[in-house]
């Protein structure tokens, strides 16, 4: 496996736009914001794309608050039939699916944390599979949820390097540079450990 995603960024911060107390934190705060708002979302979107691309089972249908729980159980059952252990599995769900499953009376009655959901309004787990809410923009088009096992995908970040240069030549302030070398791979013999549900276009 050879990583193909070699990404970099650079930006400057003018020292004159910050007062004395802000200056010491300005470059570090800007770098953290860049990582949080740009780098991490890009890597996550790429990973979800690769996971969906490599899935053995992709189902298209419609999710409503009346069938969200049953739709999810169908996916979990598919993994069980593919000899995928539920231990180590997780589900990434869109905000729409999250809303539908929270309103599905079957889930509220039968979910693993049904009492906590009734009391606290929290989404919990289904058959030991944790539900992780993901912004729809992170998923490929029309994907509602993904159930996968951690053994199915490897996603190395081979190089993650960030530097802040204080007053480099020609700049009165900071030059911030970063480079990330990463990829994501679905293992050929683990494709059956991924279940993707999409809505009809």
Positions of predicted regions on the chain:
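Sequence/fold signature of self-assembling virion shell proteins
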Residues: 1-7, 22, 104-201
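Alpha-helical scaffold segments that mediate packing/assembly in large oligomeric complexes
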Residues: 15-82, 195-201
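Residues forming anionic-ligand binding surfaces in small-molecule and nucleic-acid pockets
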Residues: 5-18
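Extended, solvent-exposed, turn-rich assembly/linker loops in the middle of proteins
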Residues: 53-123
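Intrinsically disordered or highly flexible coil/loop and linker segments, enriched in small
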Residues: 44-48, 85-88, 185-186
């Amino acid at each position: 496996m050879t990583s193909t995603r070699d990404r970099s960024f650079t930006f400057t911060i003018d020292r004159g736009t910050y007062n004395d107390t802000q200056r010491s934190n300005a470059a570090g705060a800007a770098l953290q914001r860049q990582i949080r708002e740009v780098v991490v979302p890009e890597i996550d979107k790429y990973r979800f794309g690769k996971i969906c691309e490599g899935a053995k089972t992709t189902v298209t249908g419609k999710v409503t608050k009346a069938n969200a729980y049953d739709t999810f159980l169908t996916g979990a059952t598919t993994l069980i039939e593919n000899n995928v252990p539920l231990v180590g599995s997780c589900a990434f769900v869109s905000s729409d699916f999250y809303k539908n499953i929270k309103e599905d009376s079957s889930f509220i009655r039968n979910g693993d944390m049904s009492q906590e959901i009734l009391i606290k309004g929290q989404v919990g787990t289904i058959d030991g599979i944790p539900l992780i809410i993901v912004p729809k923009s992170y998923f490929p088009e029309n994907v509602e949820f993904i159930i996968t096992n951690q053994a199915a995908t490897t996603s190395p970040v081979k190089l993650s390097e960030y530097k802040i240069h204080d007053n480099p030549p020609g700049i009165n302030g900071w030059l911030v540079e970063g480079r990330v070398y990463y990829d994501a791979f679905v293992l050929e013999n683990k494709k059956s450990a991924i279940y993707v549900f999409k809505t009809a276009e």
